[in-house]
């Protein structure tokens, strides 16, 4: 018997909620609901940080699949990670999206100042894929099904 019912969301803690939200909205995600501040006993208990307060934006893909939660801590101040972490460093390293036109997505992000981590690669005759370094060092994997 499985205890997991579905994959609900992936959470990313960020410093600049506006910039990161705009990046993902530019990729085609949609803001779900309104920005929300969360604080109090519930948050302190779940995350194990007393007197914490965070602002959250939930984003969803147009098809309504797994959501992306962006969280920016008001208190305590966020702890910076490595903004240049590479794909082989331990921990969550990328968030992946299937796109209709990989080159167009890469070109649009490049126009906004976001570059490739490596280059565009092809896996057999099935996928074209690239890693883009987004705001705050977030690695975003973009994949286009070609076969």
Q: What positions do the PLM features span?
A:
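Core segments of cupin and vicinal oxygen chelate
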Residues: 13-65, 104, 111, 130
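Vicinal oxygen chelate
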Residues: 7-15, 55-74, 81-108, 128-133, ...
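Acetyl-CoA-dependent GNAT
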Residues: 72-76, 144-147
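A cross-kingdom feature marking solvent-exposed beta-strand/loop segments within repeated
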Residues: 40-45, 78-82, 119, 123
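N-terminal beta-strand motif that seeds the catalytic metal site of vicinal oxygen chelate
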Residues: 1-21, 27-35, 91-97, 146-147
């Amino acid at each position: 018997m499985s205890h997991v019912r579905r994959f609900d969301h992936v959470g990313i803690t960020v410093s600049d909620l506006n910039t990161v939200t705009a990046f993902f909205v530019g990729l085609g995600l949609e803001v779900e609901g309104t920005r929300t501040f969360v604080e109090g006993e519930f948050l302190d208990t779940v995350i194990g940080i007393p007197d914490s307060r965070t602002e959250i934006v939930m984003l969803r893909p147009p098809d309504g699949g797994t959501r992306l939660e962006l969280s920016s801590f008001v208190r305590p101040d966020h702890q910076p990670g490595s903004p240049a972490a590479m794909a082989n460093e331990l921990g969550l390293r990328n968030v992946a999206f299937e796109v209709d036109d990989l080159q167009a997505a890469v070109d649009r992000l490049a126009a906004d100042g976001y570059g490739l981590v490596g280059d565009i690669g092809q896996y057999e005759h099935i996928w074209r894929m690239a890693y883009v370094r987004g705001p705050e060092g977030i690695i975003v994997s973009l994949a286009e099904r070609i076969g």
